[in-house]
């Protein structure tokens, strides 16, 4: 699955998750929940941001069970966030591996390009 297909799948599942009563289409790792609390963000705000996310790094599925990628999106406050998202196509759901605020020392101003 290429980056464009991953982006479409993430956006679709995020939209469907918002419309569902149980929110079971997006799962969160323990690490991601810890980071969410550390950033003082609401889970729903990040999940809503995934509806318009952009894949900025596509990771090869060499040693990983699920294909994953790094996405960029924004909270309603226009604050950018990055999330590593694993895609479970067989179950039609997402796993948020981690979520964080991109730092200026690691990322260019566009939040899409790593500094070298």
Question: Residue locations for each model-derived region?
Answer:
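Ribonuclease/tRNase effector modules and their secretory precursors
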Residues: 1-116
């Amino acid at each position: 699955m290429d980056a464009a297909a991953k982006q479409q799948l993430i956006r679709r599942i995020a939209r469907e998750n918002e419309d569902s009563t149980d929110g079971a289409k997006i799962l969160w790792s323990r690490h991601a929940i810890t980071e969410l609390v550390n950033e003082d963000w609401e889970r729903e705000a990040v999940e809503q941001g995934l509806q318009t996310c952009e894949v900025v790094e596509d990771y090869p599925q060499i040693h990983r069970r699920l294909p994953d990628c790094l996405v960029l999106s924004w909270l309603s406050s226009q604050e950018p966030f990055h999330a590593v998202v694993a895609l479970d196509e067989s179950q039609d759901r997402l796993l948020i591996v981690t979520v964080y605020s991109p730092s200026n020392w690691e990322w260019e101003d566009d939040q899409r390009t790593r500094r070298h």
